[in-house]
Structures are given as structure tokens and as C-alpha cells.
Regions:
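Structural preference for solvent-exposed beta-strand-turn elements
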Residues: 1-159
Length: 159
């Protein structure tokens, strides 16, 4: 049996052109925030969801109102789970009717501290961020790819 070992280089100097979709833009913003903003982002989507994400990552408030931005809710829920501090993430009345239980359960399985403030399974959420304790979870195969991607983005922040 052949064994292959892949190791990351110390640094990568390159430019990557991505389309400016809201999902790619929001994921790039989260990855950049997790990496202490080490790269310059250009060509981000100008949609409301991306503007909400930029504001949420930069304003430093303990309560984050993502309005109706579903991608921001999913990516920020995972992001806040691994960043120090206690924050509340909320949104519009409609956002508070959109389920997020599958993602919250997966993050809790990794050791995240997330509380439902009003109704179980739905925003708003109180999240206390810290390094996650586990590195293995199970997800149903039919969940949103944004749930999966937000969990993958958090992988380096597990023990």
C-alpha cells in the first residue's frame, strides 16, 4: 500500500479570483476573520447578506443583528462558537422562524456552548465561544451545504 503525506507550506503567496456570490463572499470573510485578517479581499458580493456579514465581523458588539441574512446566520453561528466571548445573534421575525437546530446540534457535539433564547431550534442564540473539544461529528446527508461548510471552516479550532 502506498502512503502519501501532504504537508502545508509555511506561506503561500498567490492571488485567487473567485466569483462574487454571497455564499463565497461570506465564507471568504469568515475564513479571513478566523485567520486574523491576513489577506486582502476584493470583488466581494454587494448583496445585503455580505454587507450584514462585513458589519457583524467589524462592529464588535455583543448583540449581532443579521436581519434576514440566512448565510450570515449559519456562518456566524459556527464562527462565534470558536471565537472568545459571549454574544447574541438574532435577526428579523422571519429569521427567528428559520430552523438552525441541525447546525447547533453539530456544534454542540463538538463542545460548543449555544443556547436558544426564545424557541428551541431557532434563533436568536446566545453563543459562548472557545476552542472546541472534539473533532468528530455526524451530519445527515441532506443538510444545507452551508452547515457543512461552516463546520469545515471551524476545523482548525478544535482540540
Amino acid at each position: 500500500m502506498m502512503q502519501i503525506k501532504v504537508t502545508a507550506p509555511a506561506q503561500i503567496h498567490t492571488t485567487i479570483q473567485l466569483p462574487s456570490s454571497k455564499s463565497i463572499s461570506n465564507r471568504a470573510l469568515i475564513i479571513n476573520a478566523l485567520g486574523n485578517r491576513i489577506f486582502q479581499l476584493e470583488n466581494l458580493s454587494d448583496c445585503d447578506d455580505t454587507q450584514v456579514m462585513i458589519h457583524a465581523l467589524n462592529d464588535g458588539k455583543n448583540t449581532i443583528d443579521i436581519m434576514a441574512a440566512g448565510t450570515a446566520m449559519r456562518f456566524l453561528t459556527a464562527y462565534l462558537s470558536v471565537t472568545p466571548g459571549t454574544r447574541i445573534i438574532t435577526g428579523t421575525q422571519r429569521m427567528q422562524q428559520r430552523p438552525i437546530q441541525v447546525l447547533v446540534n453539530a456544534l454542540r457535539e463538538l463542545g460548543a456552548e449555544i443556547e436558544y433564547i426564545i424557541n428551541d431550534g431557532y434563533p436568536p442564540l446566545r453563543i459562548t465561544g472557545h476552542k472546541l473539544q472534539k473533532d468528530t461529528i455526524s451530519l445527515p446527508g441532506n443538510v444545507s451545504s452551508q452547515y457543512t461548510l461552516s463546520l469545515i471552516d471551524d476545523c482548525p479550532y478544535t482540540k
